[in-house]
Amino acid sequence: MAKSSREKIKLISSSGSKHYYTTTKNKKAPSKKIELKKYDPKIRKHVLYKEAKIK
């Protein structure tokens, strides 16, 4: 099987609710850490999510 060109990452909520989303990111493209505004169902608001590595 071929090696994937995408890296799995975790987007962690900045609200402190410990909620996270998982997604993939292109390994080869030079980029900064991802920061997205997404919905946090635990606090029922849109908050900033920051990229973190999956352990």
UniProtKB/Swiss-Prot annotation:
Q: Which UniProt keywords apply?
A: Ribonucleoprotein, Ribosomal protein
Task: Give the domain of life.
Answer: Bacteria
Which GO terms fall under molecular function for this chain's record? Answer: structural constituent of ribosome
Query: Is Metal-binding tagged as a keyword?
Result: no
InterPro entries for the chain: Ribosomal_bL33, Ribosomal_bL33_CS, Ribosomal_bL33_sf, Ribosomal_zn-bd
One cellular component GO annotation, for this chain's record? cytosolic large ribosomal subunit
Keyword Ribonucleoprotein among UniProt keywords: yes
One Pfam family in the UniProt entry: Ribosomal_L33
Biological process terms from the Gene Ontology for this record are: translation
Family to which the UniProt record says this protein belongs = Belongs to the bacterial ribosomal protein bL33 family.
| PANTHER family the record matches | 54S RIBOSOMAL PROTEIN L39, MITOCHONDRIAL, LARGE RIBOSOMAL SUBUNIT PROTEIN BL33M
Q: What is this protein called?
A: Large ribosomal subunit protein bL33
Source species: Buchnera aphidicola subsp. Baizongia pistaciae (strain Bp)
